[in-house]
Regions:
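Short, hydrophobic secondary-structure boundary micro-motifs
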Residues: 109-112, 152-153, 203-205
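Hydrophobic alpha-helical connector segments
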Residues: 62, 76-106, 159-162, 201-212
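C-terminal peripheral helix-coil segments that are non-catalytic and often amphipathic
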Residues: 1-2, 96-99, 103, 134-143, ...
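Amphipathic alpha-helical packing segments from all-alpha helical-bundle domains
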Residues: 69-76, 121-147, 156-160
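Amphipathic alpha-helical segments used for helix-helix packing
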Residues: 102-121, 138
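Hydrophobic/aromatic residues within well-ordered alpha-helical segments
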Residues: 56, 63, 67, 71, ...
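Helix-turn-helix
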Residues: 16, 20, 24-58, 62
Length: 222
């Protein structure tokens, strides 16, 4: 997967503008960036810029929306391979989240920190997606608690803790570090399973069909 520096190269037209906005917002912060900064970095005129986007808020929305969709696609791809076990499902979405936050730090930080700059209509869409993300973790943890393999007495706190620590990776992870993304993801899987108090041996047996009552002995006494 290409690093962030490689994604900074100019494309053509709409792609170049979006890429320039990603870099400008990431380096300066959304509030400090003007539409002229983005056009200059993309190597296009303002008229070309407005042909594709109405302004920098529209660009932010495109970046946040695209990042959110890519993140959910990665979580879905991982979870579909995890089977029905809540422990494996939680490991899958934690792994996908950490990898995405580490490999796409610019996009992740924009999504996690600049969403307040969206319009009211755009915020509604963002909050729906945010709710879907929360529900994904919530349903997995609730299933594990119901089955008796997640023993935490505080599933909501565990969910918030897991999501927060995974999202925070985008703020501090650097590719030049000694630890690979895969190693980091596996360590966070271990931490997440500790938070939910994963006990696979404690799975509650599913109720089986009732055994038929024994037939009465109708033989005559000797």
């Amino acid at each position: 997967m290409p690093g962030e520096g490689e994604r900074g190269g100019r494309g053509t037209g709409k792609e170049a503008i979006l890429d320039a906005a990603r870099q400008e917002f990431g380096e300066r912060g959304y509030a400090a960036v003007s539409i002229r900064h983005i056009a200059r970095r993309a190597g296009v005129s303002l008229s070309a810029m407005y042909h594709y986007y109405t302004g920098k808020q529209d660009l932010l929305h495109a970046l946040v929306n695209g990042s959110g969709q890519a993140y959910f696609d990665s979580c879905r791809a991982e979870s579909e391979q995890a089977g029905d076990d809540p422990g494996e499902q939680l490991a899958a979405v934690v792994r996908a989240t950490v990898r995405y936050r580490a490999e796409y730090r610019l996009e992740s930080n924009l999504t996690l920190t600049e969403w307040r700059s969206l319009s009211e209509e755009q915020l509604e869409e963002f909050r729906r997606r945010q709710f879907d993300g929360t529900r994904m973790f919530k349903e997995i943890i609730e299933a594990g608690v119901d089955q008796g393999i997640f023993r935490t007495p505080h599933p909501e706190d565990a969910r918030r803790g897991v999501i927060a620590m995974c999202n925070a990776v985008a703020q501090w992870y650097r590719e030049s570090g000694e630890e690979s993304v895969d190693d980091l993801a596996e360590r966070y899987v271990e931490l997440a399973l500790v938070l939910v108090e994963y006990r696979p041996a404690a799975r509650r047996p599913r109720p089986s069909a009732a055994s038929p009552a024994p037939r009465p002995d109708v033989r005559s006494p000797p």
